[in-house]
Amino acid sequence: MVLPLNIPKEGKFTNDELIALCLANPELNIERDEKGQILITMSPTYALTSSFNSGLNFEIYSWNKKNKAGIVFDSNSAFFLPDDSMRGPDVAWISRKRWDSLSDSEKKSIPKIVPDFIIELQSETDNIKELKQKMTKWIKNGVKLAWLVSPQTQETLVYFNGKTETIPFGKTLGGKNILVGLELVMAEIIEG
């Protein structure tokens, strides 16, 4: 469940103030949309969703460790995006070349960089319509490949090259030309 935090117009947070808000409230998952609206996701997630998320992170991390192609992030990460939003996906991956272009101070904060790949995992309390809108915003900001994983429907929506494809959990998902060589079957990661 995502709750909007109402802030007077004159009270729009700067990036530094938003980071301070996040640090002062580590138990909350805080994001900002492109209009400056602060969004708070209730924490913690349910046990099953947390387990699924761990499995997804493990698979992407394992592929990346073998290929040494970039950096993997979990659901505690966040990124400042070109539309002025700050978003945190459940899983993110950034190519090594792009990650290495950041300064050390950027790497130690919330960086202004768009992940190459993200995964959003629908929890029991997430609204699928809102998640689909969020996926569209990820793509508009420059994410090259995005997966919306829905244990409820046993499907993954794949966003790539301006198209959306629905892949049933029993079929193989590929990393396209972004995570080259990655192949996963969601049914083997997420129990129905």
List where the protein language model places each region:
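Gly/Pro/Ser/Thr-rich low-complexity, intrinsically disordered segments predominantly at protein N-termini
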Residues: M1-G192
